[in-house]
C-alpha cells in the first residue's frame, strides 16, 4: 500500500515507525522547523528527525491546498495521521484511494481536538483510550475504525500517559493497516455526545491553591512535566511538578521548581522560606 504519513510531535513517532514497516511509505509530511529553547534556534520536529533516520522524504508545506496540487497526480492508497497539528482540506482528503486514517488519543467522540490527554487528567478520568478514524473535513468527526480503552493509573502524569497512549495508538494503527491490506477495514459513525478540547493558553497553567485538593492535583498531573502548573506561594510564583492529597485530605506539594533555585521537594521549599 502506497502511503503518506502526516505528523509533527513526539506522540506521532511510534505511529510513523509502524507506517514505515506496514506500508510502502512514499513520504512524511510535517510542520516546518520552529524556534525552540533559550536560543530560539530553528529546530526540526520529532517526526522530521525520525523520518531522517528512516531515510524517508520529508515535506514541510506551508499551504495545504498548494501541497494537494503538488502530490495530487501520484497514486496513494492511504494517508496516515498522528498529531500533525493541522486539519487537512477536502482537496487532500480526496486523494488517497482508501482514505485518511488518523490516530487520536481519546475514546471518540469524547475529547476531540488538540488536548485530549490533558483534558482526561484534568477531569480526573480513570480511563481514556486511543481511536483510529477515517478523516472527514470536521474536527475528529470521521467514522471510527477501531478504538482501545486504556486505564489511567493513580497519580499518572501527562508525560507518562502521553507516552503510553503513543505506543497504544501505534499498535492499533498496525492492526488497522493489517485489516486494510486484507480489505476488511471496519467503519461506523461516531455515537454519543461529543466534546471538544482546545489548545492550551497561559491562563490554563494557573492553579489556585485555595481550590479543592483533588482539583489542584488533577491540574498539576495534566501539565507535568511540561509546561507545568503555576501557583503563587506567599507572593512567589513557582511551577508545581507533582502533588497529592494526604491522608488528612490536605494538599501535599511533592515537587516544584522555584525561581533561581531549580527543582526541589515541596518540603525543602517550605522550610527554605520559613513556611514549615
Regions found by a protein language model. Name each.
Residues 2-8, 28-31, 37-127:
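Active-site-proximal cofactor/substrate-binding loop regions of enzyme domains
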Residues 3-22, 33:
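N-terminal beta1-alpha1 ligand-phosphate binding loop
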Residues 13, 17-20, 68-72, 174:
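Amphipathic, non-transmembrane alpha-helical secondary structure
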Residues 20, 78-196:
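Donor/substrate-binding cores of folate-linked one-carbon enzymes
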Residues 30-34, 148-151, 257:
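Short, histidine-centered active-site or binding-site loop motifs used for metal coordination
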Residues 190-204, 237:
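A short beta-strand-loop-alpha-helix capping motif that often carries His-Thr
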Residues 204, 209-276:
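An anion-binding loop in the catalytic cleft
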Amino acid at each position: 500500500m502506497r502511503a503518506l504519513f502526516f505528523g509533527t510531535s513526539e506522540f506521532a513517532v511510534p505511529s510513523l515507525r509502524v507506517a514505515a514497516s506496514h506500508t510502502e511509505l512514499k513520504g512524511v509530511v510535517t510542520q516546518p522547523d520552529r524556534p525552540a529553547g533559550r536560543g530560539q534556534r530553528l529546530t526540526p520536529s520529532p517526526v522530521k528527525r525520525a523520518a531522517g533516520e528512516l531515510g524517508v522524504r520529508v515535506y514541510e508545506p506551508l499551504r495545504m491546498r498548494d501541497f494537494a496540487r503538488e502530490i495530487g497526480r501520484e497514486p496513494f492508497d492511504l494517508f496516515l495521521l498522528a498529531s500533525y497539528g493541522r486539519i487537512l482540506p477536502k482537496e487532500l482528503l480526496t486523494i488517497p484511494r482508501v482514505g485518511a486514517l488518523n490516530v487520536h488519543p481519546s475514546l471518540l467522540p469524547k475529547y476531540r481536538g488538540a488536548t485530549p490527554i490533558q483534558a482526561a487528567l484534568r477531569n480526573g478520568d480513570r480511563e481514556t483510550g486511543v481511536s483510529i478514524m477515517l478523516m472527514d473535513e470536521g474536527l475528529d468527526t470521521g467514522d471510527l475504525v477501531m478504538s482501545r480503552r486504556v486505564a489511567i493509573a493513580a497519580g499518572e502524569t501527562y508525560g507518562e500517559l502521553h507516552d503510553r497512549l503513543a505506543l497504544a495508538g501505534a499498535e492499533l494503527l498496525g492492526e488497522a493497516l493489517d485489516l486494510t491490506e486484507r480489505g476488511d477495514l471496519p467503519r461506523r459513525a461516531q455515537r454519543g455526545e461529543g466534546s471538544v478540547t482546545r489548545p492550551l493558553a497561559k491562563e490554563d497553567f494557573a492553579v489556585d491553591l485555595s481550590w479543592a485538593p483533588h482539583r489542584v492535583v488533577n491540574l498539576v498531573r495534566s501539565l507535568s512535566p511540561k509546561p507545568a502548573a503555576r501557583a503563587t506561594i506567599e507572593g512567589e510564583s513557582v511551577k508545581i511538578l507533582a502533588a497529592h492529597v494526604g491522608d488528612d485530605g490536605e494538599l501535599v506539594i511533592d515537587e516544584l521548581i522555584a525561581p533561581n533555585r531549580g527543582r526541589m521537594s515541596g518540603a525543602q521549599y517550605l522550610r527554605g522560606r520559613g513556611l514549615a
